[in-house]
Each structure stands twice: as structure tokens, then as C-alpha cells.
């Protein structure tokens, strides 16, 4: 049962994407739910994996910001909260 739940959460983690009309906080809430679920079943997801997942899962409207982050930050060292703050600030600058 535990293995089945873990496999379902792993699949959800891999497939989760942010849609163009979704707010970043909503997307991150869903992603964080999956990460916490996996942790509760005994599997820790490395921060660098979560950072890369977030950057891969953002819609086209975030493309310029993703490129900037990838070029200027060490993705193995950036803190998830730092990334979240940066993306939330960027989202506020997007036309609504």
C-alpha cells in the first residue's frame, strides 16, 4: 500500500505543471503537497530537485525569468524560499 501511494505521488510530481491562468502560489501549494506526502511515506525530495521541477513546470509567461535564474543562480545551491520569492515578485509584474 505504501509503495503504491509513493508511486502515485512520484507520478504526480513528475506530471504536475503550472497552467497559464494559474497563480504561482496555487501551483506551488499542489507541488508542496506532493513533496510532503512523499516525505511522510519516507522519501525525501532533494531541494535541488524541487527547484528544477518548479523551473521546468512554469508556463511560457515565466520563460524570461526562468532563463535569468538558470544563468545567474547555482540550481544546486538556491534555496526554495528564495526561488519562490523571486517568482512571486516576477508574477506581480506580469500583465493580468
Where do the model's predicted regions map?
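Intrinsically disordered, low-complexity linkers and tails enriched in Lys/Ser/Pro/Gly that lie
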Residues: 1-96
Amino acid at each position: 500500500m505504501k509503495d503504491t501511494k509513493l508511486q502515485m505521488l512520484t507520478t504526480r510530481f513528475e506530471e504536475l505543471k503550472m497552467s497559464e491562468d494559474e497563480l504561482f502560489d496555487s501551483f506551488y501549494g499542489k507541488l508542496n503537497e506532493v513533496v510532503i506526502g512523499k516525505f511522510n511515506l519516507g522519501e525525501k525530495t532533494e531541494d535541488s530537485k524541487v527547484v528544477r521541477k518548479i523551473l521546468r513546470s512554469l508556463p511560457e509567461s515565466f520563460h524570461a525569468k526562468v532563463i535569468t535564474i538558470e544563468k545567474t543562480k547555482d540550481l544546486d545551491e538556491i534555496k526554495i524560499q528564495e526561488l519562490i520569492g523571486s517568482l512571486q515578485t516576477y508574477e506581480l509584474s506580469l500583465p493580468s
